[in-house]
Structure formats: C-alpha cells, structure tokens
UniProtKB/Swiss-Prot annotation:
Pathway(s) served: Lipid metabolism; fatty acid beta-oxidation
GO CC terms: cytoplasm
Subunit composition and interactions: Heterotetramer of two alpha chains (FadB) and two beta chains (FadA).
UniProt family annotation: Belongs to the thiolase-like superfamily. Thiolase family.
UniProt xrefs under NCBIfam families: AcCoA-C-Actrans, fadA, PRK08947.1
Organism of origin: Pseudomonas fluorescens (strain Pf0-1)
Entry annotated with the keyword Ribonucleoprotein: no
HAMAP family in the cross-refs: FadA (MF_01620)
InterPro entries given in the database record: FadA (IPR012805), Thiolase (IPR002155), Thiolase-like (IPR016039), Thiolase-like_sf_Thiolase (IPR050215), Thiolase_acyl_enz_int_AS (IPR020615), Thiolase_AS (IPR020610), Thiolase_C (IPR020617), Thiolase_CS (IPR020613)
Protein name, per record: 3-ketoacyl-CoA thiolase
Reactions catalysed: an acyl-CoA + acetyl-CoA = a 3-oxoacyl-CoA + CoA
Length: 391
C-alpha cells in the first residue's frame, strides 16, 4: 500500500486495565498519574519515537474538575519524558472525547501543523463523579425533551422505537462479558493492556494486567433477575445491560506517514476518514448511524467493505438499533465487538474513544481485517466515527 506523506498513521496503542469505580484497583491512583504512567510506558516501548518530537498531547476528559481540572493533558504530560517544549490540550465531546482528540491530531497532521502527537483520554469516575459540579440549564427543556440529559431514558426510548426486547438486551449483555472473558483468557488483550500497580480487594498493592470489571459468571438468568434501572414501570434497561462506571485511560501515538517512514516505523493502521453527526438528544444513542454513514461516504466505502466494527456499548438498548440500521446486526457475531465492549469493560467517558479504536486495531491485526470502523454515541445527541485501514 502506498501512503501519502500527510496521511495519518497509528503507531501504537495502549490502555490501562479497567478498574471498578467503587473500591476498584485504581481507587488510590489519581487520574493524572494514571495518564502519565500510560503515556510514559507507551513511549518507552516505542524507542524510535523521540519524545521531543511530540507536537501536542491531546487528551480527552469529560468532567474537568478536581484532579481532572486545569488541563489534565498538560498536567499529565509534565510528569512524563515529554519535554516542557511540547504542548498539551484537554478536549471534551462527552463520550467521544478521546476519539475527538484523535481527530484533532489527525486534522493537524493533514494540514501540516505537526508530525507526531500523543492522544488519548482518561476518566476517574471513582474520584470525580459523573454529576460533580454539573448545573444543567433549566431553559434547555424549551429546546429538547427534558429527559434528554438522562442517558438511560434515552436508551429506553431508542429501544422502544426499534422494538428491542428485554431478552435481546440481556443476551447482548451476556455476550459482552463472555467475549471479554474469552479475550482475556486467550491473551487477546495482552498487546493493549499496559500493566499498572493498584490495590486488590484486601488492600494489597499488586500489579494488574487484566480488567477487573469482567464478570464471566453472567448468565441470561442472572440478568433477567435485575430490575429496570431507569424506568421502574415497564422499563427494559438494567444495570446489567448498561455500560459500567469504571476508571481507566487509553493512549495512542499518531504521526504523519512520512515521519513514520523516516523513522523506520511500521504503523498499525492509517485513518481513512472521520465524521461527527448530530441527532435528536432524546435518542442520543442513535448518533453512530449518521456518523458512520458520513464517514463511509468520505472513505468511498460501503458497509459491506468493513471487516470489523467497534461500537461503544453504552446500552444494549442503544447498540442493537444502531447495528440494525447500519445493517450489520445479522453479522454481529462475525464482525462486531469481538472482544466484548463497555458492558463488560466499562465506559470511563474520556477514555473510551481511543480505547475502542485501539481495540479495533488489535482485532484487525489478530484476524487479518483490512477496514475497520470505530464508532460511538455521545450524550445530548451526537455520534462520532473513524474508518481505519490496516497497513
């Protein structure tokens, strides 16, 4: 494959083990420290990349307050081998933040505004709760349905509109845990998880090289016993079919194809197209459909050209309608989230976009795929998608 000099290539990807937010492995680790550790280790294993060449550290983070405030990208960068002469910015597109970080870096490379970037994101939902410091404008209800800010209710709405049953959602939830457990046992996450020290349930310091969020014992029967989490009267969305509240970080090294060639680096993949799209906030989970359609059109590809998909599992009731309308539901077991998803691994907001992108690249590498799509819904009615080609 011949690449143009300003094509954007992914050099490497790594992530932390995913930790439970309540009493989990990262309970005594700050978000900046988690981010800095990840960046440092990823640079250490890429010896051909000079940290001094990093133009910018672009880091996704949603709740930018407390330890995640005051530009956590810069805070984390200062604690790594990246020199002070490199810059840092923190971005938020809610759930799509670290994929937006990737897009921002890609756009800079494409326009000649830098050659080497470190991108990713973090969310420590155990230290900085989802609603900490949030003060929604009550006037918003004049412009969008009042429940649009309640993600679980938007999932209920989307599931109802598309005829998604409780049983279908439970089966999807079981699948996520089973596939994530299988990937763990078979070492499929080995290339992407960068071990971190943390504390086990007994308070002992240990090195974690696995996700503590996966529940292999999950069954259809155990999920069927759960009560609705958001709509007690007739609701179908439960805690077991929703993304977990977890702590984690993800990181990528991206650069221009020309710089990768000059350094003698074999990239993992090249970005073929990117897109964002908006939808009615009341069905925010539908965002991946128009975003993916737009990205595919820009890449000159059709849905059948895509070998593998990573779709962020915000809710089973949201993921299934997306797969249905993208016309890949019948190919789910061959193409979609083959290592499980956020129902098993969790959804640390600022982390997830780069996490699903990196997991996709590993799935493509392990299974020989050529084209892949990473996509996710975004609170208040957006979608974001990236089309990758393996090189």
């Amino acid at each position: 494959m011949s690449l143009n000099p300003r094509d954007v290539v992914i050099v490497d990807f790594g992530r932390t083990p995913m930790g439970r937010s309540k009493g989990g492995m990262h309970r005594n680790t700050r978000a900046e420290d988690m981010s800095a550790h990840l960046i440092s280790k990823l640079l250490e294993r890429n010896t051909k990349v000079d940290p001094a060449e990093v133009e910018d550290v672009i880091w996704g983070c949603v709740n930018q307050t407390l330890e995640q405030g005051w530009n956590i990208a810069r805070m984390a960068s200062l604690m790594t081998q990246i020199p002070h002469t490199s810059a840092g910015q923190t971005v938020s597109r809610l759930c799509g933040s670290s994929m937006s970080a990737l897009h921002t870096a890609a756009q800079a490379i494409m326009t000649g505004n830098g050659d080497v970037f470190v991108v990713g994101g973090v969310e420590h939902m155990g230290h900085v709760s989802m609603m900490h410091g949030v003060d929604p404008n009550p006037h918003m209800s004049l412009y969008a349905a009042k429940a649009s800010g309640m993600m679980g209710l938007t999932a209920e709405m989307l599931g109802k509109m598309h005829g998604i049953t409780r049983e279908q959602q439970d089966a999807f939830g079981v699948r996520s845990h089973q596939l994530a457990h299988k990937a763990t046992v078979e070492g499929k996450f080995k290339d992407e998880i960068i071990p971190m020290q943390g504390y086990d349930e007994n308070g002992f310091l240990k090195t974690f090289d696995y996700d503590e969020t996966i529940r292999p014992e999950t069954t259809l029967e155990s999920l069927a016993a759960l009560k609705p989490a958001f709509n007690p009267k007739g609701g179908t969305v439960t805690a077991g079919t929703s993304s977990q509240i977890t702590d984690g970080a993800s990181c990528m090294i991206v650069m221009s194809a020309q710089r990768a060639q000059d350094l003698g680096i074999q990239p993992l993949a090249v970005i073929r197209s990117m897109a964002v799209a908006g939808v009615d906030p009341a069905i925010m989970g539908y965002g991946p459909v128009p975003a993916t359609q737009k990205a595919l059109k820009r890449a000159g590809l059709g849905i059948n050209d895509i070998d593998f998909f990573e779709l962020n599992e915000a809710f089973a009731a949201q993921a299934l309608p997306v797969l249905k309308d993208l016309k890949v539901l019948d190919k789910m077991n061959e193409k979609v989230n083959l290592h499980g998803g956020a129902i098993a691994l969790g959804h640390p907001f600022g982390c997830s976009g780069a996490r699903i992108s990196g997991t996709l690249l590993n799935v493509m590498k392990q299974n020989g795929g050529t084209f892949g799509v990473a996509t996710m819904c975004i609170g208040l009615g957006q979608g974001i998608s990236t089309v990758f080609e393996r090189v």
